[in-house]
Amino acid sequence: MSILQSFTFQELKNLLPNRAKDSHKGNFGKVLICAGSPGMGGAGILASEASLFCGSGLVTLVTDTSNVSSSLLRNPEVMITGVDMVEGVNIDLKIKDHNVILYGPG
């Protein structure tokens, strides 16, 4: 017996719940991603993009300031906070306000 199963995109779409017409991004999960050393923003960009693709409502990326421009160009719908990853920083991320936290991909 194989654990692999094939499906069509239409079959997958039928498994997803319908979103209410009066819903908004705050109804579909808040994701906080902390990623991206200076000049190494790819993992943060890809993680935030994957989060949006999976249906997350609100995605916030905290990354080094050198990665902010490229992150915004790739995914303007992601909220981005630039910090100095070398010096270290203490910012209020309001962790309790998020449903998912991804720390350090890449």
Predicted features along the sequence, with ranges:
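Small-residue (G/A/S/T)-rich helix-start motifs and N-terminal tracts that mark the onset
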Residues: 1-106
